[in-house]
């Protein structure tokens, strides 16, 4: 396969997963609107706290499984070892079931200590307990998704992801409504209506997560069983196949998982550390429990929810780049490796810059449109933290790139350095400058920036890739700034004419997309060859030619 075909294929597969991630995030964003209306900022605090605890145990138990499985499957498929691929699948399913069960037991028995003593959010225990069985389901589902990604097809993962989120959305809102009402009655009896209503409502929200995971697992299982009937016939035609022992596969699986596990744990535990440090220091500084809960509820329920939508594109592209890079790296195709790294970084920067600028410019209108929140605090957080979209998009992608070229320890080392410095900055901002929740926003963005710099150095060192600056960063950045001006002016004009925030916001976003695309092409930020690598690239090229934007 040529470099061009290789990078095109992996970008198309990555785009499929990215589109599924975007759709899933949009569904997630949409259902968070009625969910927030039901449980409020305090309920969002309990909900967010429960998820941070759940996420850490998910990361430790099975988050790295899809990546590890896709790496091993991709490497063996590139060598034609299908019987070994089947063994990898069986071993990974056993591994996922065991690790998920252990994590579920830990969460069940330690939930009270973690929520009350460490996180200072005792009422989140109801939501945490609901999430316990989900750890087992997600572990097995992750293995299946990793298997398909290793085969080079993202469609089963993409469809299961969307189905999972649809079920999640429906059940979350319904269960939150029902349990919030029940919590109100319980709270009335116990003399604490507000906290118990929010706590039970948050538990209802987490019930949707487990239900969605079960739906995703059922779909993935159906596709896997259908595929294996064909795959087993292909295995029979494989002659003189060298098959690794089960003990060896478990060993390799474990060796592959550990570095990924360490890097993802360190990379993602900054969120739970942020909450713990913020709440403990804010408590020592004399802020009321209600204020702390409100601030953190806005941060986790609104700010993080919005910021994570564009970052999910980078996560999807990172997931798709690992098996493609592993296959190229295993076969010694250095030029193909560098080509795919270049394609992935350029694609993600073209998306991240306008998302960051747009989110910053339209912070207040978006919050009013989605959450009916016109508070200065929420808007300021989004304006100040929008730049982290660029940082986390690039750092998330570069983690995947390093793992794809078998430099598993580099993200671990880089994440550890960034985490230590990030915690230091957070403590200084909280104590010396008393920035309360803004300190978390600044420190979080700083963590993403450090990961970008450190990972970029590692990618260059181990792949020989030299980063091009002008077309990758400067032109998308300038195009996004021009777009930002157009978005601001068009919003003000539409608001003046129609006096309706929803119309003005949607109109300004539409104008922003057009302006960004036009300026990007006029500044030669994308070539015709690069556009052709995108899904529906030929149609985009024809449109650009008709508008005389390509020569």
Where are these regions (language model features)?
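Interfacial segments at transmembrane-helix termini and the short loops linking adjacent helices
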Residues: 112-131, 359-389
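Helix-loop junctions and terminal segments of transmembrane helices
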Residues: 63-78, 311-332, 345
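N-terminal membrane topogenesis motif
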Residues: 1-27, 83, 87, 240-267, ...
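Membrane-interface junctions at transmembrane-helix termini in multi-pass inner-membrane proteins
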Residues: 138-161, 387-417
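Interfacial/gating helices of multi-pass transporter permease domains
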Residues: 36-56, 123, 195-203, 249-256, ...
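Signature of the first transmembrane helix
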Residues: 9-67, 104, 135, 258-277
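Membrane-proximal transmembrane or re-entrant/amphipathic helices at the cytosolic face
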Residues: 489-551
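Membrane-interface helix-loop junctions in multi-pass transport and translocation proteins
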Residues: 155, 166-223, 409, 419-453, ...
């Amino acid at each position: 396969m040529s470099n061009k075909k290789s990078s095109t294929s992996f970008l198309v597969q990555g785009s499929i997963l990215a589109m599924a991630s975007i759709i899933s995030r949009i569904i997630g964003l949409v259902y968070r609107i009625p969910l927030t209306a039901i449980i409020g900022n305090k309920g969002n605090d309990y909900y967010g706290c429960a998820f941070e605890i759940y996420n850490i145990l998910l990361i430790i138990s099975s988050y790295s499984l899809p990546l590890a499985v896709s790496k091993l499957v991709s490497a063996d498929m590139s060598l034609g070892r299908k019987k070994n691929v089947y063994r990898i699948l069986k071993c990974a399913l056993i591994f996922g079931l065991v690790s998920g069960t252990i994590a579920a037991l830990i969460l069940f028995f330690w939930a009270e200590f973690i929520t009350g003593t460490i996180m200072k959010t005792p009422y989140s225990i109801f939501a945490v307990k609901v999430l316990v069985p989900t750890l087992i389901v997600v572990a097995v589902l992750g293995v299946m998704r990793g298997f398909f990604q290793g085969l080079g097809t993202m469609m089963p993962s993409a469809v299961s992801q969307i189905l999972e989120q649809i079920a999640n959305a429906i059940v979350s809102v319904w269960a939150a409504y029902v349990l919030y009402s029940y919590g109100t009655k319980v709270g009335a009896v116990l003399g604490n209506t507000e906290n118990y209503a929010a706590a039970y409502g948050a538990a209802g929200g987490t019930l949707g997560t487990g239900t969605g995971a079960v739906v995703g697992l059922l779909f993935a299982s159906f596709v896997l069983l259908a595929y294996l009937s064909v795959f087993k016939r292909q295995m029979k035609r494989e002659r003189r196949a060298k098959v690794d022992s089960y003990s060896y596969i478990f060993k390799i699986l474990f060796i592959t998982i550990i570095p990924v596990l360490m890097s993802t744990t360190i990379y993602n535990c900054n969120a739970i550390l942020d909450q713990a440090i913020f709440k403990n220091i804010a408590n020592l500084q004399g802020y009321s429990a209600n204020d702390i809960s409100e601030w953190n509820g806005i941060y986790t329920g609104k700010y993080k929810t919005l910021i994570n939508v564009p970052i999910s594109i980078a996560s999807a592209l990172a997931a798709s780049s690992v098996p493609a890079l592993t296959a190229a790296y295993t076969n010694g195709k250095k030029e193909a490796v560098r080509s795919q790294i270049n394609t992935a970084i350029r694609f993600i920067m073209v998306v991240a810059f306008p998302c960051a600028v747009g989110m910053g410019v339209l912070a207040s209108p978006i919050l009013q449109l989605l959450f009916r929140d016109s508070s200065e605090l929420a808007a300021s957080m989004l304006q100040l933290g929008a730049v982290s979209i660029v940082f986390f998009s690039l750092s998330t992608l570069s983690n995947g790139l390093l793992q794809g070229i078998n430099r598993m320890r580099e993200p671990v080392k880089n994440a550890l350095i960034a985490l230590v410095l990030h915690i230091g900055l957070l403590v200084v901002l909280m104590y010396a400058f008393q920035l309360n929740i803004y300190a978390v926003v600044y420190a979080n963005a700083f963590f993403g920036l450090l990961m970008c710099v450190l990972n970029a150095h590692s990618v260059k060192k181990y792949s020989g890739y030299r980063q091009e600056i002008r077309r990758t960063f400067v032109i998308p950045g300038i195009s996004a700034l021009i777009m930002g001006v157009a978005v601001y002016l068009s919003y003000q004009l539409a608001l003046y004419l129609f006096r309706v925030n929803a119309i003005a916001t949607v109109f300004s976003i539409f104008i922003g997309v057009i302006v960004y695309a036009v300026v990007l092409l006029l500044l030669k930020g994308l070539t015709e060859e690069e556009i052709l690598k995108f899904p529906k690239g030929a149609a985009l090229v024809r449109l650009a030619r008709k508008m005389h934007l390509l020569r």
